[in-house]
C-alpha cells in the first residue's frame, strides 16, 4: 500500500512537471502573462485558477484571452477578483444570454397580441432570409456594459488595471485580429461570437467572429509583448471518437476542434506553465455544471502552488479602478445621438425608450430603456456608449435596424375545444403608412379560422385600425353532447391610443354575423352592429405561465345599434382582470376576476355569457371555467373568481392548483349577486418547451354529479 501511494504521488508530480517547461528559469523581476483559452462553459475553469492566483498574491502584468477566456480575462483585467467573478458566473443565467429572449413586459402592445408563433421567417425582395445565428447578443451587451461600467471611459486596454488584449477572427479574410484598443465590451463580444450561436460583431468596416477559429490559446501574443513567464489555462480536450460522431452538430464541432487542436499545440511552446483542468465529459454548453467546472479549475490550479509561489507578488489586494465621476452608478444624460438609423428617427427612439432629456440615469435604467426599443422588433441589435464632452454628456446608440418588412410565421396548437390547428401567418410592417402593423392568421385544422389585424400605431395619439375574424365551434351540455353549432364572423373598425405600451384605450364599431344550427336543422341567422369602447393592459411577464404583471380587458357596448326602439337597446359591460403576484422565486399567486352585466331585456342568445372549458381564444362572451364543458353554462350576468397557486421547479416545469367559483343570474339584484351557483377545483402540470406550453389539466366541478374532465393543451393559444 505504501509503495502504491509513493507511485501515485510520483506519477502526479511527473504530470505536473510535464506541464511546466523543463528548461524554465525564472528571471529576476519577471513579467507575468496570463493566457486564457476559449471553450464556452469550460472557460469557468479559468475562474478557479484565478482564485488560486489571488490566494497566492501573484502579480499579473498582462492578460490575453479568447472567447470565454476574453470575458473572464477582461473582468480580471478590469479589477474584479477571482471570487467576484465566481459570484458573477454563479448568478448569471447563461442559457438566457444565448437564447436572447425579448422581454414580453417591454413588448409593444401590438406585439403582445401576436406572440404565438414558433417560427418567423423574414422575406426580403420576395426571398426567404435565414437567420445568421440563434442570438444577436443583445443581452450580452446589457450584462457586459453593467459589469465594465467602471472602466467604460478607457479605450486603450493597456491602461486597464492589468493590461489586456483579446483575439477575434475577421470573418471576411479569416485572419486573426488582436484587439488592444477601442470599445472593450464590443471587442470582447467579437472575441466570443461563436458562429451560429452569436451574430458576427461589426467593428469599423469589418465583421468578426470567435477568436477560437484562428488562435484559441493566445500565448504567443503575450511573448510578442515581451512577457517572460506565460501562465496558460488550457481547455483543450481530445477529439471525439467515431461512435460519438453520429449527428451533424457533432461532426461540425469536430471539424472546428481539429483546427483548434492544431493551433493549441503550436501555442504550447510559448506557454511556460500550462495548467490543464480535468474537463472530461464537459462541453462548451455544460452551463449546468458551472460549479463543478469552476471547482476543477481551482483544484488543478492548487497543484501548481510550488512553482507559482516563486513568481513576483503584487503590492496591493485590490485592483478595482476607482469610481469614474462620469461613468458612476448615477450619471447625467443631456442628449441622444444615433448612428446607423435610416428608418426610425430620434423622436421615435426617445418615445419608445421613455427617455427624457436631460435626466439622471443608471446603467440598469439605460439597459431597460434599450430593451423596450429592442422589443419593438424594429431593431436587430443596439450597442451604446456614454460620451462626455467638456460641458455635457450624451447617450450614443449604435443601431442595426431590422429592414425586413414582410414575414411568414408558423405555429401549432392543440386544445380540447378547437382541437388541432396549424397556424399560417403573413405579417407586414410599414404597409401603406410608416407606423403600421399587419397580421393575417389562417388556422388549418379541425376548426378552421382566421384573424386579420391592421393598425396604425401613433402612440398616445389615436391611431386607426381594422380587425376581422371568423370561426366555427360547438356548444356542449353536461354530458359533453353538442347542443348547438355556431359560425361567427366579426368585422371591426376602431381607433386606439396607446400609453407607454402598457395601456390601450379606444372605441369602435363591430359587425357580427352568426349562423347557428343543430343537426342541419333549425338554422338561425343573425347580424348585429355594435358600437363599443374598451381599455386594455397587459404587463404579464409570460403569456402561458405568468408570475407577475397584470392583464386587463374591459369593454362596454351597445348590442344591435340599428334596433328601432332606442329605449329597448341593450348595453353590456364586461371586464377580465388578471393579477399575478410573485410570492417567492418558485411560488406565484394568480387571481382572475371576471364579470359581465347586461342592462336591458331580451338579450340575443348569441351575446349571453357562456362559461366552461379550458381555452384562451377570444370568442364572443365566452369564458374558461375548469370542471365544465365548453359553453356548458349560460346566463345574462356573471361573476367569476379564479384562484391559482403556481409552483415553478427545474426552470421550465410548473404545477398549479386552482379553485374557482361563479355566480350566474339572469337579473341584476343584490340577492342574486351574492349567491355562488357553481365552483370547481383543478390541478395543472405544465412544461414551457421551446415549442410553447405543454399542459395537462384535471378539473372537477363541485356540488353536482358531473364527472371530472381531463384537458390537454399543446402550443401557444390562437
Question: Where do the PLM segments sit?
Answer:
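Bacterial Sec-dependent N-terminal signal peptides
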Residues: 1-25
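Patatin-like phospholipase
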Residues: 19-66, 74-371, 375-387, 393, ...
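Outer-membrane beta-barrel and related beta-rich outer-membrane complex signature
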Residues: 245, 476-478, 517-521, 566, ...
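Gram-negative/organellar outer-membrane beta-barrel architecture
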Residues: 364, 369, 383-544, 614-623, ...
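C-terminal outer-membrane beta-barrel translocator/porin domains of Gram-negative envelope proteins
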Residues: 410-412, 531-650
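Short glycine-rich beta-strand segments
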Residues: 469-473, 510-514, 555-561, 596-598, ...
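C-terminal hydrophobic structural anchor segments
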Residues: 646-678
Amino acid at each position: 500500500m505504501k509503495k502504491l501511494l509513493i507511485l501515485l504521488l510520483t506519477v502526479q508530480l511527473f504530470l505536473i512537471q510535464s506541464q511546466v517547461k523543463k528548461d524554465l528559469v525564472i528571471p529576476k523581476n519577471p513579467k507575468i502573462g496570463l493566457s486564457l483559452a476559449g471553450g464556452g462553459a469550460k472557460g469557468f475553469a479559468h475562474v478557479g485558477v484565478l482564485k488560486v492566483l489571488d490566494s497566492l498574491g501573484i502579480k499579473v502584468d498582462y492578460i490575453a484571452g479568447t472567447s470565454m477566456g476574453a470575458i473572464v480575462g477582461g473582468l480580471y483585467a478590469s479589477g474584479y477578483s477571482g471570487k467576484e467573478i465566481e459570484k458573477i458566473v454563479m448568478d448569471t443565467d447563461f442559457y438566457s444570454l444565448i437564447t436572447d429572449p425579448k422581454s414580453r413586459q417591454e413588448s409593444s402592445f401590438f406585439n403582445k397580441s401576436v406572440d404565438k408563433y414558433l417560427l418567423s421567417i423574414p422575406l426580403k425582395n420576395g426571398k426567404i432570409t435565414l437567420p445568421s445565428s440563434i442570438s444577436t447578443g443583445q443581452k450580452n451587451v446589457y450584462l457586459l456594459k453593467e459589469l465594465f461600467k467602471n472602466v467604460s471611459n478607457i479605450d486603450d486596454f493597456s491602461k486597464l488595471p492589468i493590461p489586456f488584449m483579446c483575439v477575434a477572427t475577421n470573418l471576411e479574410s479569416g485572419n486573426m485580429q488582436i484587439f488592444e484598443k477601442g470599445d472593450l465590451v464590443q471587442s470582447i463580444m467579437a472575441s466570443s461570437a461563436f458562429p451560429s450561436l452569436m451574430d458576427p460583431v461589426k467593428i469599423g468596416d469589418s465583421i468578426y467572429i470567435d477568436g477560437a477559429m484562428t488562435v484559441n490559446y493566445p500565448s504567443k501574443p503575450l511573448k510578442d509583448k515581451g512577457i517572460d513567464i506565460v501562465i496558460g489555462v488550457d481547455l483543450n480536450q481530445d477529439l471525439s471518437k467515431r461512435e460519438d460522431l453520429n449527428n451533424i452538430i457533432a461532426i461540425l464541432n469536430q471539424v472546428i476542434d481539429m483546427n483548434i487542436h492544431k493551433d493549441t499545440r503550436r501555442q504550447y511552446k510559448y506557454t511556460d506553465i500550462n495548467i490543464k483542468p480535468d474537463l472530461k465529459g464537459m462541453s462548451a454548453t455544460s452551463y449546468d455544471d458551472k460549479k463543478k467546472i469552476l471547482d476543477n479549475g481551482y483544484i488543478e490550479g492548487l497543484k501548481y502552488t510550488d512553482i507559482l509561489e516563486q513568481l513576483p507578488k503584487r503590492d496591493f489586494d485590490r485592483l478595482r479602478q476607482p469610481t469614474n465621476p462620469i461613468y458612476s452608478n448615477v450619471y447625467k444624460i443631456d442628449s441622444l445621438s444615433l448612428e446607423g438609423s435610416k428608418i426610425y428617427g430620434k423622436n421615435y427612439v426617445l418615445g419608445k425608450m421613455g427617455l427624457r432629456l436631460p435626466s439622471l440615469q443608471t446603467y440598469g435604467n439605460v439597459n431597460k430603456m434599450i430593451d423596450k426599443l429592442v422589443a419593438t422588433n424594429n431593431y436587430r441589435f443596439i450597442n451604446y456608449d456614454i460620451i462626455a464632452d467638456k460641458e455635457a454628456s450624451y447617450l450614443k446608440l449604435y443601431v442595426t435596424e431590422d429592414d425586413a418588412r414582410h414575414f411568414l410565421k408558423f405555429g401549432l396548437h392543440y386544445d380540447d375545444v378547437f382541437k388541432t390547428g396549424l397556424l399560417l401567418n403573413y405579417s407586414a410592417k410599414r404597409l401603406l403608412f410608416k407606423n403600421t402593423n399587419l397580421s393575417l392568421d389562417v388556422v388549418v385544422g379541425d376548426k378552421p379560422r382566421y384573424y386579420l389585424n391592421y393598425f396604425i400605431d401613433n402612440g398616445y395619439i389615436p391611431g386607426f385600425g381594422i380587425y376581422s375574424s371568423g370561426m366555427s365551434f360547438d356548444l356542449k351540455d353536461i354530458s359533453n353532447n353538442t347542443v348547438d353549432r355556431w359560425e361567427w364572423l366579426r368585422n371591426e373598425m376602431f381607433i386606439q391610443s396607446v400609453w407607454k405600451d402598457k395601456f390601450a384605450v379606444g372605441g369602435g364599431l363591430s359587425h357580427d354575423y352568426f349562423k347557428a344550427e343543430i343537426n342541419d336543422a333549425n338554422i338561425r341567422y343573425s347580424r348585429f352592429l355594435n358600437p363599443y369602447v374598451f381599455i386594455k393592459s397587459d404587463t404579464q411577464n409570460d403569456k402561458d405561465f405568468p408570475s407577475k404583471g397584470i392583464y386587463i380587458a374591459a369593454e362596454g357596448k351597445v348590442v344591435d345599434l340599428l334596433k328601432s326602439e332606442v329605449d329597448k337597446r341593450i348595453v353590456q359591460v364586461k371586464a377580465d382582470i388578471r393579477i399575478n403576484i410573485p410570492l417567492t422565486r418558485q411560488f406565484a399567486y394568480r387571481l382572475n376576476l371576471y364579470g359581465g352585466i347586461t342592462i336591458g331585456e331580451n338579450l340575443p342568445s348569441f351575446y349571453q355569457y357562456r362559461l366552461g372549458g379550458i381555452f384562451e381564444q377570444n370568442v364572443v362572451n365566452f369564458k374558461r371555467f375548469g370542471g365544465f364543458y365548453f359553453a356548458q353554462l349560460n346566463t345574462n350576468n356573471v361573476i367569476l373568481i379564479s384562484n391559482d397557486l403556481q409552483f415553478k421547479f427545474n426552470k421550465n416545469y410548473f404545477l398549479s392548483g386552482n379553485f374557482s367559483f361563479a355566480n350566474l343570474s339572469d337579473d341584476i339584484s343584490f340577492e342574486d349577486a351574492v349567491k355562488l351557483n357553481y365552483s370547481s377545483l383543478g390541478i395543472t402540470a405544465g412544461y414551457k418547451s421551446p415549442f410553447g406550453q405543454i399542459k395537462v389539466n384535471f378539473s372537477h366541478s363541485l356540488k353536482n354529479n358531473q364527472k371530472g374532465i381531463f384537458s390537454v393543451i399543446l402550443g401557444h393559444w390562437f
